[in-house]
Amino acid sequence: MIAWTRFRERPWSGPALALIAGLAAALAHPPFGVLPGLLGYAGLLHLLDNADVQRPLRSVFWRGWLAGVGYFGLGTWWVGEAFLVDAATHGWMAPFAVTGMAAGLALFWGLAALLYRALRPASAWRVLTFAGAFAALEWMRGHVLTGFPWNLPGETWKAGSAPSQLAALVGAYGLTWITLAIAGAPAVWRQGRGGRAATGLAVASLIGLYGYGAIALSRPLSPSGPTTVRIVQADIKQDLKWDAERFAQIVQAYVSLTATPYAAKPADIVIWPEGALPAAVNDYLAPGTWVRQAIVDSLAPGQLLLIGGYRYEGAGPHPTYYNSLVALRRTETDLELVGIYDKHRLVPFGEYLPADRFLTVIGFKSLARLSDNFTTGPTPAPLRISPELLVQPLICYESLFPGLAKPDPNVRALINVSNDAWFGVTSGPPQHLNLASYRAIESAKPILRATPTGISAVVDARGRIVPGASLGLGESGVIDAQIPGMGQVTPYDNFGDVAFLALILISGVVSARVRIGKISSSIAPKRKLS
């Protein structure tokens, strides 16, 4: 006890505890799954309430920012792995990328802490103000520039678990508000009757979260349709991919797996991941090329092939590039183009360079070895790949964004192709799978997910991986499955983030009532004794 008191007296104890609180909250996310880490949010709320009284704004901001550094540092450290693919050239950038990303994303938490402080809540119900401030800034994190909603607090719950099912009602942002309100409540439980009431409501809400989820998981989905799919994962490591001498070997790996004998009839759809082959789709699918013929030979007549890859339009030294999903059908002797989906949400500094002209002038583009930018595709829309089958493609990190694709009741499944090979055997790929699976819950539609090195999977409309329908990191093989059934149209599909906005409004009303109550108390005339 004495040691703890001495520690608390240190000027650096608050910042250190804030960093630890952020780390704890990050540990609650998959693949770690240490759910008691959610108490990190209660710790952060306590630290914000007990900021330095002499410099409160500065103290609050830095505590929020440091908690964010811990949260995003542990949550996105895997981004450094991408710079180690070509370590001799880019390895020196890895520590700067990891720390820079964590520090930049943590600014949203610093601003959220300032917003919480500005509202100056005093009652125990300030936990709702805390939830509203941080949930609002998390929404901003998902929308500023192109947005990066990686590991929203509401997506702490493993997709497919009971608590995750509430995303079908309120979406990932609404679930973020609810998660923060529940997790922050222990910070106020000692504050008299109001604190006990707030904590009791949080406990009841947690029970309700699990109860609603259990009911949702027990509801039957529509029967699986007759459409079958084969997902191909060739386990081509990123550092080998751009070796020109290995190109034929990579093609052979994909076509061999595609042609693997079926237990019954050939699948209706074959899916290759994003960037499956290290060349432009225009080039390797050009008429007469050996690659085109190899693909034709690997398919049965009538089969559909969905290939993730880059393509270009126009001639000359600077054509227009797109990151695309190309749908092809095998005819009797050749391939015919069925449709193309172009990625809409591009990765900053990975697929395009913000302020391109300026950064090119100062030499950053050359330093980072970025070639011509990809071009943004149109607003995401479903792709009809057969007369009876409409799918919604999501390329790579498009699967992070709640509500990115407009709901369409005729869509049968979501197709997520991604190249997670950049991130090796780290926490990045399993986290990406978890986040993508939330789109299944929100839309009540299954996801067919293909990656080069894992994790490929068939995910049902409740966010659960279909038993036996996944390939882990470093595995090579195919997934053969029927497309799972759908659920009923969800409130989130119908109304989007309306529920989230209502929750933010509740936070605002609580804060306003507390402040009005304070003002009224301060100006009310004091009763004189007669």
From Swiss-Prot:
It is found in: Cell inner membrane. It is an enzyme of class 2 (transferase). Keywords: Acyltransferase, Cell inner membrane, Cell membrane, Membrane, Transferase, Transmembrane, Transmembrane helix. One of its GO terms (molecular function) is N-acyltransferase activity. Residues 232-485 form the CN hydrolase domain. One of its GO terms (biological process) is lipoprotein biosynthetic process. One of its GO terms (cellular component) is plasma membrane. It comes from the Bacteria. Its EC number is 2.3.1.269. The active site is at residues 274, 343, 396. Pathway: Protein modification; lipoprotein biosynthesis (N-acyl transfer). The chain crosses the membrane at residues 19-39, 65-85, 96-116, 128-148, 169-189, 197-217. It is a multi-pass membrane protein. SUPFAM superfamilies: Carbon-nitrogen hydrolase (SSF56317). PANTHER family: APOLIPOPROTEIN N-ACYLTRANSFERASE (PTHR38686:SF1). Belongs to the CN hydrolase family. Apolipoprotein N-acyltransferase subfamily. HAMAP family: Lnt. Catalyzes the phospholipid dependent N-acylation of the N-terminal cysteine of apolipoprotein, the last step in lipoprotein maturation. This is Apolipoprotein N-acyltransferase.
